[in-house]
Amino acid sequence: MRTVYHQRLTELAGRLGEMCSLAGIAMKRATQALLEADIGAAEQVIRDHERIVAMRAQVEKEAFALLALQHPVAGELREIFSAVQIIADTERMGALAVHIAKITRREYPNQVLPEEVRNCFADMAKVAIALGDSARQVLVNRDPQEAAQLHDRDDAMDDLHRHLLSVLIDREWRHGVRVGVETALLGRFFERFADHAVEVGRRVIFMVTGVLPTEDEISTY
C-alpha cells in the first residue's frame, strides 16, 4: 500500500514540474509578445493560461486526496504541503506572464517599451526564464544545493530591476507618467516571476531537509 502511495507522490511531483514548465513557456511567449509587438504570441499566452488554472485545480485535488488517503508520515507531509505551496507559486508565475501579454495586446500595434529600456527588459526576461527553467529542474532532481542557487542567481534580477527604476526616475525620462508607470509595472511582473521561482526552490529545500530556510539561511545549503 505504501508503494502505491509513494508512486502517487512521485506522480504529483511530476505534475508540479509540468506546471512549472508551462509557466516558463508562457513567460517566453509573453516576452516575445512584448519585445516584438507579437499579438499572436500575446493571445496564445492568455488562451493557454486556462490549462495552467485547470491543472492547479486538479493537482490541488490530488494533493488533498493524498492527505486523506492514509496517515502520511513527516516526510510525506512535507511533500504534500510543499506541493500545495508550489502549485500556487507556479500558477502565479503563469498569471504574471498573462499580465504582460494583456498589456501588449492592449497597446498593439504600438510597441509598449521605450527604446532606452528594451535591452534591460530583454535581460530581465532572460534571467526570469532561466530561473523558471531551473525551478522546474529542482522539482525533478530535488537537490537542495541546486535549489539554493536560485536565490543567488536572483541577485541579477534585483540589479536589473534597480537599474530600470533608476532610468524611470531620471530627469532625462521623456515619455511621461503613464508610460513610466506601465513600464515599472511590467518590470515588477518579471521580478515577481523570478521571486516565485526562487520560492519554489525554497520549498524544495524544505521538502528534502525539513527546514524552511530564511533568506539569510538559504545560501548555506
Swiss-Prot record:
Function statement: Plays a role in the regulation of phosphate uptake. In this role, it may bind, possibly as a chaperone, to PhoR, PhoP or a PhoR-PhoP complex to promote dephosphorylation of phospho-PhoP, or inhibit formation of the PhoR-PhoP transitory complex.
Predominant cellular place of this UniProt entry's protein: cytoplasm
Alphabetically ordered keywords of this record: Cytoplasm, Phosphate transport, Transport
Matches recorded under Pfam families: PhoU (PF01895)
GO molecular function: protein homodimerization activity
Similarity comment: Belongs to the PhoU family.
Name used for this protein in its record: Phosphate-specific transport system accessory protein PhoU homolog 1
Gene behind the chain: phoU1
Keyword Flavoprotein recorded: no
Origin: domain of life: Bacteria
Gene Ontology biological process terms, A to Z: intracellular phosphate ion homeostasis; negative regulation of phosphate metabolic process; negative regulation of phosphate transmembrane transport; phosphate ion transport
One GO CC term on file: cytosol
The protein's assembly and partners: Homodimer.
Compartments (UniProt record): Cytoplasm
InterPro entries from the UniProt entry: P_transport_PhoU (IPR028366), PhoU-like_sf (IPR038078), PhoU_dom (IPR026022)
